[in-house]
């Protein structure tokens, strides 16, 4: 080992991480040890501006004072109660989300976007099976979309590069072109139960859905 390698804390921790963590991503050789709002500091104390923001989940900043206080308060009361019971914070947040959004009257809490998509796929198929028939199970998504990396969400992700090593995927997904209502109509048949769409696609550029297309959809 070179002297510089020994002194570089980033490299030391990076090598340890490469040894013990699954290589699900190609990581850059920098290791962050603390963060505050938009700033990050690596193991050597170098300061960075965070332009990734946890892919959006840290949009109020790292170590936000209000978030820290809310977490401490809740941890001091109750952390988890399982799905066998309600807890008061869960119920209050669900009501607030319904009131603010004005969209729907039910909330489904999940840990990630891919879990939200899995839940949506299951709900759409169960509803269609109960209301119509078992044959109404197909879901239309859009080319260049990204919905997650679990098997159901990956099946809705219309990107061959991301799907090919995990074949066979979940059956019953068709892919249309964004902002092309005719391509959607051509995919709809008696087996279609739902359409899943990102109003703004973020993979391979920023692809924005036209307002008229969304209205027709």
Model feature map: region roles:
Residues 49-52, 194-201:
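Short beta-strands and strand-loop turn motifs
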């Amino acid at each position: 080992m070179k002297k510089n390698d020994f002194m570089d804390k980033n490299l030391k921790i990076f090598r340890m991480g490469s040894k013990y963590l699954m290589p699900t991503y190609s990581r850059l050789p920098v290791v962050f040890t603390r963060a505050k709002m938009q700033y990050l500091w690596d193991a050597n104390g170098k300061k960075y501006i965070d332009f990734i923001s946890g892919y959006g989940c840290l949009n109020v900043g790292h170590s936000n004072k209000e978030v820290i206080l809310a977490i401490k308060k809740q941890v001091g009361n109750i952390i988890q109660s399982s799905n066998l019971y309600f807890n008061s914070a869960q119920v209050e947040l669900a009501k607030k989300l319904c009131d603010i959004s004005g969209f729907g009257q039910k909330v489904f809490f999940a840990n990630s976007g891919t879990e939200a998509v899995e839940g949506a796929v299951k709900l759409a198929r169960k509803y269609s099976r109960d209301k119509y028939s078992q044959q109404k199970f197909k879901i239309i998504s859009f080319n260049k979309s990204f919905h997650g990396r679990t098997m159901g969400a990956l099946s809705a992700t219309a990107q061959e590069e991301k799907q090919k090593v995990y074949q066979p995927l979940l059956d019953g997904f068709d892919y249309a072109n964004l902002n092309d209502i005719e391509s959607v109509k051509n995919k709809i048949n008696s087996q279609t139960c739902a359409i899943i769409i990102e109003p703004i696609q973020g993979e391979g550029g920023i692809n924005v859905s036209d307002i008229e297309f969304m209205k027709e959809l």
